[in-house]
Amino acid sequence: MTDSVNTRELALGVLMEVTEGGSYSHLVLRSVLEKHQYLTKQERAFLTRLAEGTIQRMLELDYILDRFSKVKVKKMKPVIRNILRLGVYQLKYMDAVPASAACNEAVKLAKKKGFASLGGFVNGVLRSVGRDLGE
C-alpha cells in the first residue's frame, strides 16, 4: 500500500510542477520516471495515467470540484487543489481504483503535505463527488 501512496505523491509532484511551475508535463513525467526507476511497470503505468489524465482533463475536474466544494477551485491552496483533482480523476476515470481508496489516499496525502486540518474537507468533497458519480 505504501507504493500506491508513493505513486500518488509522485503524481502530485508532477501536477504541482506543471500547474505552479509552468513546466511541460511530458518532460516532468519523464524526469520523475527516470529518477524513480525502482517503480514496477504497473506503478509506472498508474503514475503516467494519473498524471497525464489529470492534466488533460483539468478543466472538467475543476468544474466538478466547483460543483461540490463550497470553496471555489481558484481560492484553494495549490496543493489541496491538485490533490482533489487527482482524487476526482481516479473516481471518474480509473475504474480499478475503489472510491474508498481514492478518498483515503487523498486524505493521507493532504496530511503528509502538512494540511492535516483540511483532511475532512478533502474527504467530504471527494465522498460527495463519488456519491454523485454512483460509486
Residue ranges and their predicted role:
Residues M1-E135:
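Class I Rossmann-like S-adenosyl-L-methionine
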